[in-house]
């Protein structure tokens, strides 16, 4: 029975987290963008989309998502999960505000076999759940797959970002995810997070280990810290005019998405050039088809150009140079959930940080490297990525935990 499951260290590193190589463009156009009718405003909605400076809206995000997911053969249910407006004890300002406006988490749940283990997938910075479009069919054959847009990204609600500290910013993502879990009535699930989503997933598992059966971190942020050498380099760089400019942009919370908005109707062209380069000429693995490239480009544009919200976490989570302010390495000894790290062999995220964390962990931990894959290994080498996930979850898939103990061919252990 099937069910519809309802430099070395510079700001360049952060730009790669947001769009992994998106070209820099003049941000002066941002001033023009703010003067034009916003896509989400009442005045903006009255304009035909073709005449808006930023031609997007929440409806267009969801429409682009549906077009992208039309590639997926497995049936699914898309829903906006209401997470309320004021979870008790939250550290986030908007949760404590007088506004009773509910918040929603955009969620897609794929058809699965009865009693299949639940796999929850969390996207990275500047991305959304649709980035996993090449993985849903294969993973849904073994799991009950649920993918979400984190609060402030994709088709989820985009509240004004009022966080003023690292603690409050982490709570923005962790508390909203916990409210989503309650609304979905999930108790035991496998949690997979990519890049910044891996950071959020790990922080969530540290606070709520009772709900997470296994943690899969794909090229996660948060496992590197500022070394003495890089600190010296940054000090010297800040003293230059370029360093002062970059530092000013960082402290102003300038994000790559602002470039896309600032370009207005020319933004889609920039995104198209990025997609063609990252998943085409510069790809380390399986190239996108023409259809995939067109649909993914359209989807990425609408998710990046929409109202700034979750993206503004940047300076509170990362210090200048893209080092996390609260490295997960500091919490490795407190880990309570068995963990698997997955890295593409060409991933610019350093897997040595995971090796260092493993030494401190008191729970089972393995590190798998997938060939022909970069930071978006699940797009670059889908079959290799699926093999790594199935291997990581062999205990839940085989029933007795004894089958498939050897690493699948092509994968390597670090």
Swiss-Prot record:
Keywords: Acyltransferase, Cytoplasm, Lipid biosynthesis, Lipid metabolism, Phospholipid biosynthesis, Phospholipid metabolism, Transferase. It comes from the Eukaryota. Residues 117-382 form the AB hydrolase-1 domain. One of its GO terms (cellular component) is cytoplasm. It catalyses: a 1-acyl-sn-glycero-3-phosphate + an acyl-CoA = a 1,2-diacyl-sn-glycero-3-phosphate + CoA. The HXXXXD motif is essential for acyltransferase activity and may constitute the binding site for the phosphate moiety of the glycerol-3-phosphate. This is Probable 1-acylglycerol-3-phosphate O-acyltransferase. It comes from Oryza sativa subsp. japonica.
């Amino acid at each position: 029975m099937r069910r519809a499951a309802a430099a070395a260290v510079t700001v360049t590193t952060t730009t790669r987290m947001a769009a992994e190589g998106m070209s820099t463009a003049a941000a002066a156009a941002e001033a023009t963008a703010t003067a034009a009718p916003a896509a989400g405003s009442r005045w903006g909605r009255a304009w035909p989309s073709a005449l808006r400076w930023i031609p997007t809206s929440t409806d267009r995000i969801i429409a682009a998502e549906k077009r992208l997911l039309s590639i997926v053969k497995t049936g699914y249910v898309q829903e906006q999960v209401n997470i309320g407006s004021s979870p008790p004890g939250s550290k986030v300002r908007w949760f404590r505000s007088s506004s009773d406006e509910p918040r929603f988490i955009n969620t897609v749940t794929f058809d699965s076999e009865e009693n299949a283990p639940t796999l929850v997938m969390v996207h990275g910075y500047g991305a959304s759940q649709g980035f996993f479009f090449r993985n849903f069919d294969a993973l849904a054959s073994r799991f009950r797959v649920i993918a979400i847009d984190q609060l402030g990204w994709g088709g989820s609600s985009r509240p004004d970002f009022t966080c003023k500290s690292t603690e409050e910013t982490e709570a923005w993502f962790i508390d909203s995810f916990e409210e989503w879990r309650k609304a979905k009535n999930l108790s035991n699930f496998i949690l997979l997070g990519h890049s910044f989503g891996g950071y959020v997933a790990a922080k969530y598992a540290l606070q709520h280990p009772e709900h997470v059966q296994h943690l899969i971190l794909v090229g996660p942020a948060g496992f590197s810290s500022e070394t003495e050498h890089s600190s010296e380099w940054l000090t010297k760089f800040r003293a230059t005019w370029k360093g002062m400019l970059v530092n000013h942009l960082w402290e102003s919370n300038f994000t790559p998405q602002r470039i896309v908005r600032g370009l207005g109707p020319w933004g889609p062209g920039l995104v198209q050039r990025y997609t063609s380069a990252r998943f085409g000429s510069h790809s380390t693995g399986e190239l996108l088809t023409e259809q995939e490239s067109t649909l993914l480009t359209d989807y990425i544009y609408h998710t990046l150009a929409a109202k700034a919200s979750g993206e503004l976490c940047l300076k509170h989570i990362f210090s200048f140079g893209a080092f996390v302010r609260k490295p997960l390495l500091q919490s490795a000894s407190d880990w309570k959930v068995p963990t698997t790290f997955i890295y593409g062999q060409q991933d610019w995220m350093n897997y040595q940080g995971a090796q260092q964390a493993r030494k401190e962990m008191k729970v089972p931990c393995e590190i798998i490297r997938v060939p022909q894959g970069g930071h978006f290994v699940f797009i670059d080498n889908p079959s290799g990525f699926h093999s790594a996930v199935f291997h990581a979850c062999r205990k839940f898939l085989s029933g007795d935990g004894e089958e498939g103990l050897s690493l699948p061919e092509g994968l390597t252990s670090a």
